[in-house]
Amino acid sequence: MKSLRQIFLIVVISLNNNVFSSEDDKTFQEQSMLSVLYAQTAAEFSANNIQVYNNAKIYLDMALIDKSWTAALEQKFEYSSKKPAIILDIDETVLDNTPFQARTIIKGLSYPNGWVDWANEGQATAVAGVSDFLEYANKKGVKIFYVTNRIH
């Protein structure tokens, strides 16, 4: 009789876990939808990105003036003769992938499903403010490096 109760308890817990995870998935999808809608439509989101890249210009100018400054803490020896550089991640730093995120929500999918197809479409647009910043850095003679996990 004791083992029958244990089996019953295990079945009830298992069923509850499935209900909760299904509800959790729905809640996650709803939260994801709200964040994507905000990123795609809120003027504040775009303005914040522009402000970040405008501030990056200020800090870039400060770094170019101060020859002893480096963002690479592992650089311990003479590096002032090296060409200045910046490193940016591509996705969500340079390229806006919220259309991909919206697509996955509509289809009830999640990353990485459809990611390679999205990347190959080449439909991502620039994050607000980044193009101006990269042009600014390039005019200052700064080498630009991009980091990505995209398949080439």
Language-model segments: which ranges?
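Solvent-exposed, polar/charged alpha-helical surfaces in well-ordered, non-transmembrane soluble domains
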Residues: N54, I58, A128-E135
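Substrate-recognition element of Asp-dependent hydrolases with the DxDx(T/V) motif
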Residues: E92, V130-H152
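Non-catalytic pre-domain segments flanking phosphatase-related domains
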Residues: V19-L88
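Second-shell loop/turn segments in exported
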Residues: Y38-A47, V116-A124, F145-I151
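Active-site neighborhood of HAD-like aspartate-dependent phosphohydrolases
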Residues: K83, V94-A128, D132, K139
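Sec-dependent signal peptide recognition
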Residues: K2-I10
